Amino acid sequence: MGLLEGKAAVVTGSSRGIGAEVARFLAAEGAGVVVNYRQKAPRANKVVAGIEADGGRAVAVGADLTVPEGPAALVVAAQENFGGLDVLVLNASGGMETGMEEDYALKLNRDAQVNMLTQALEAMPAGSRVVFVTSHQAHFIASVPTMPEYEAVALSKRAGEDALRAMLPQLEEKGISLVVVSGDMIEGTVTATLLDRANPGAIEARREEAGRLYSVAEFGAEVARMATADVPSGHTEYVGGADYLAAGENA
């Protein structure tokens, strides 16, 4: 029996990349998983089909987290399909896309995260777990500068983390824990691709600095592990980038 047998999970931004890997890992542990997409239904349906082919349970749900009805739709989907909501993985993020409004990064990386958690709290019982996914470039932005092309996104993601941490007393009252997973640059993600396009050679330079970069599957496994890990609420799990940790401690 898996660690999440009979439980229900929502993974935001899970039609591809890290979120899709997290959804697969959680389903393999027995959870029924709501796979969230914003526009690309075929990608999400493919993730669901893969989970079901492996004997898991999942459903694809289209929801834009930056509008009020988006988070609510994901909570309802978890309740209607899997009987509740026990694990919430806040993976969706953005801000480097072209053609978006000026404040989109803050709307998605801070406001939408808070709105999603606020909606989820109504459905999550004591003992539930919330996992927020971020990057070292965002988590350590106050002490370690990042590349200019990513700075606005990093600041908005750090604002999101701070806003979620401000909810810790509210979570504690309900017996719900929050864990933050912070990772170095991850090979093969959309963000890494966009950064390398805006700043050619950025990925290779970071790889040389760090020694190695985690793959999407490796990082996804670490995020999924935090859904059941025996760690205190408010814990930050660092994945890769030892130089960031040293710089952050010395700042």
What do these predicted regions represent?
Residues A41-P42, G62-L74, R110:
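The beta1-alpha1 cofactor-binding region of Rossmann-like NAD(H)/NADP(H)-dependent oxidoreductases
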Residues S93-G99, R129-E173, M185-T189:
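Catalytic loop of short-chain dehydrogenase/reductase
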Residues M100-L121, G127, V131:
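Catalytic Tyr-X3-Lys loop
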Residues T12, L85-S93, N109, F132, ...:
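Rossmann-fold scaffold of SDR-type NAD(P)-dependent oxidoreductases
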Residues E29-K46:
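Conserved glycine-rich Rossmann-like NAD(P)H-binding loop of the short-chain dehydrogenase/reductase
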Residues D54-R57, V76-L90, S177, P232:
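A glycine-rich helix->loop->beta "capping" turn
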